[in-house]
Amino acid sequence: MLFAACLLAIALAPSARASDPDAQRWKREAAAVTIVRDDWGIAHVRGKRDADAVFGMAYAQAEDDFNRIETNYLTSLGRLAEAEGESALWQDLRQRLFIDPAILKADYARSPSWLKALMDAWADGLNAYLAAHPEVHPRVITHFEPWMALSFSEGSIGGDIERVSTKDLQAFYGNDPAGALAQFVPPSSWAEPSGSNGIAIAPKLTANGHALLLINPHTSFFFRSELQMSSDEGLDAYGAVTWGQFFIYQGFNKHIGWMHTSTGADVVDEFAETIQRKGGKLFYRYGDALRPVTTREISLAVRQADRSRVERRFTVYATHHGPVVRNEGGKWIAVALMNTPLPALQQSWLRTKANDLAAYMKVAEFKANSSNNTIYADDKGNIAYLHPQFIPKRNDRFDYTKPVDGGDPATDWQGLLPLDKAPHLLNPPTGWIFNTNDWPYSAAGPDSPKQADYPRYMDTVGENPRGLHATRVLTGRRDFTLASLIDAAFDPYLPAFARQLPILIADYDALPASDSRKRRLAGPIALLRGWDYRWGITSMPTSLAVFWGDILWDKASKLDTAEGLSIYDVMAEKAGPTARLDALAEAADRLEQDFGSWGVPWGEVNRFQRVDGAIKQAFDDAKPSIPVPFTSSRWGSLASFGAHRWPGTKRYYGTSGNSFVAVVEFGDKVHARAITAGGESGDPASKHFNDEAERYTTGNLREVYFWPEELKGHVERSYHPDVP
């Protein structure tokens, strides 16, 4: 692979001054916007036009955490190495295989006028903020251009691209297999399951006859802000906004609510290409013909310790299936995924303005959501489940969970499936719908879609413990309220341990009396034997079970087992008594070493800490933290707290899981309660940096001030954006 480097003496440029036309335009936009901060620091942005609201919300987001906005765009544009150096090089190359600034600029140029106006206003809001705040020093992006919004247009594209291994890219394009192997891979137990919980309850199962919606994304902490944006053009949406995007990603408006959960549908495929070289050129076999391999040059700037930058140049390859990402067994592997930023941005925005199910489904016809299921509820009493709208039609005789033969035309994608050909639900007789990143075939209990009716590629993950838990808390209830839906979302039962621990206890009981482990493990086994599988701050069994589970998880993930088994099946059926008992001994030893006893309350171990505004926190046992009762979602907890030990710590500190959580009631007037991890501001000096932490850890959701009369009496500040 071609790979060259040359030094560029590029100093970090200071923020540019606003030109007179810019400043005049910003003043007009700012005058049309009012930002109201409530007593939690949450921005309620009102504009005359939709574009004015976008200007104001971009400005408000920048006030709260500009660093996260810039970092998200450095990532989405493939420019992170300009700020973070060599460690981000292969991540940038991965992004640039799919995201081409020239194409995004062309997409912007052909955008409908209404969308151009939104992108223009978004860039204006961020640039006006930088001009008004010279004390803020961007790491790289000193001026935002409207087309950049298309690089971060939907929740799907980033997650899909991230399936490509940077280790494989380094081995292939860097011609550096040894360096690729040296990339740090954390233990599998550190990887918190990505995704979310969504639940919709029909009016017939609620106390007051109103549909209810649970919005419970599991993301890295502080990944999204919470705000409201409204206009005189019909916009009035509230919810979670990923830093730097200009649409409510998960939330609600006056009439409808939508919750996205990461899907198990197969929408990213790999094609094994047979490569031939003829006349100094590269070709790949397709049917009986040879097609030329497409090549293009990508240049990436990489920051050095002296603040200069090195330019790295790559020649990258693609077939009609997509970019080539690795060599496997002599075949080049090309990746196919959704890459339609213009329709994606339109769908992401327009669904926030939909006022009923028909309007929402019309927007879904953009088919530009690939990685998310949707749980929906509205004020007409409808509840619904949607599978991703971007689902390629394929020949189901091929196993697309593995690379398929790219030379066989029968493996090609055959367009996109109509929405009604994917699993979906509307007002099932059960009266409830959920998704926990599991398959759709249990979403409404006995009224769920039937697996036999759909191709295999509609799901690759099967059931999970959270799905079993959701079914448990929903079944048989007919009196749901906002409060009881919150209780369900924070129900402490851990179904994974309810399956795994009886097997461990049986292993122990089967030991002969002469086995040394019989005495050594008697106390820990007694503690676990009497447990009700419920987490809690004072629960000692939770600590022991989680330590045991994490150790066994890492061991089980390395076992060479038959395909088709989940990690839970491997732990229960393949790990064996010795591995399970040894993991318990190791867990007890670790607790004794770190905490002085194997009987330690879970709240002493599991902590929430936010002491600075860094995107990657450095945790410290000596600094303030608060106990968290809920566990990782891998054990079936609906409320998720992805935590583990960090360098220099004994305690577990969380970085992902419950982030923004909301429950919404669709009555005559929409009513909601919500919570955000930590607080709204990324500034440690702000009183809203960590003011929600205790409520977050206890599930004590606060009232949402959606209506003007609800906001009245809770206003800290009302202002127009300050522009130079």
Predicted features along the sequence, with ranges:
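Bacterial N-terminal signal peptides
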Residues: 2-11
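Boundary at the C-terminal end of the N-terminal hydrophobic targeting segment
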Residues: 16-18
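Substrate-recognition/specificity elements adjacent to catalytic centers across diverse enzyme folds
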Residues: 20-225, 232-234, 239-247, 252, ...
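N-terminal leader/propeptide and maturation segments of large enzyme subunits in energy/redox metabolism
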Residues: 84-119, 123-135, 304, 327-328, ...
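Acidic, low-complexity N-terminal propeptides/linkers enriched in Ser/Thr/Asp/Gly that mediate export
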Residues: 115-214, 219-220, 367, 379-383, ...
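Glycine- and hydrophobic-rich flexible loops that cap the catalytic core of alpha/beta enzyme folds
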Residues: 234-245, 251-256, 260-404
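Hydrophobic alpha-helical segments
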Residues: 239, 268, 369-477, 552
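Proteins synthesized as precursors that undergo proteolytic processing into mature forms
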Residues: 344-372, 379-380, 450-505
